[in-house]
């Protein structure tokens, strides 16, 4: 008889925490006991599977109550608490960047390297890649397997939902009241603008978000791939977009790439120039978990270009 699924969700009231609960409910995954946890939100009520839950205090919660725990409350919270949950017998999935680059902690995209999970013998801390990396590698894995990717140049156009509730509200308020714009979340106004900065700048003049794409692509897909990235924040509520140029080892046509990507779990191809069929955040990002890819083009230099949402 399977063990009951007792899940703790740290950051349950946030944008990501709420999305996790929506996905669990949509996929009809039965949670026997849910423990929503937080710090500043203790005492608030959330709803899940037709039941109301009171958010509990993370600091006083007994980790032994949970056999799986999801952290969606940022790196500092995960750093303080995640390993204590593992030591108490819980499998832990951390959505922050806190543990992604530690050699002994698996960085998992289930559709790509989920087989690693099958070999786990005991409760483990599992890192979740950056959202931009996950959608990128979902598309690139079948291409790399068939044709070998040597070089990537990525430009991201990232929605404000990736920053959190405050960013969503900032875009909404600036859009409605453009005369008195006040920026608290971002360094520049986000409404009617494009901000060529996601996360902090590092010593090499790249932002941390850009380097996440580099580090995580190499760790998950192939350390030999040369990766260049530019990340921008755009005035879109939901749905990150990425324009990708890749150089491959073996020449492939546009049709070859479409064939390679089609049928990949979690990926949908939308690419018909004649009927103006291509993905957009507005149409595809709100009601689906799939990655949508289009505008696929092949170049004579064994290069490919595409856009995905």
Q: Where are the regions a protein language model picked out?
A:
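N-terminal Rossmann-like NAD(P) cofactor-binding subdomain of oxidoreductases
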Residues: 2-190, 226, 259, 271-301
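Glycine-rich beta-alpha junction loops
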Residues: 40-42, 131-132, 156-163, 194-201, ...
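Oxyanion-binding "anion nests"
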Residues: 194-237
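Conserved glycine-rich beta-strand-loop-beta hairpin in the small C-terminal domain of fold type I
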Residues: 238-243
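Short amphipathic alpha-helices in soluble, non-transmembrane regions
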Residues: 256-264
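Noncatalytic modules at the cell exterior or secretory-pathway interfaces
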Residues: 303-305
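Conserved small/polar residues in nucleotide/adenosyl-binding loops
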Residues: 307-309
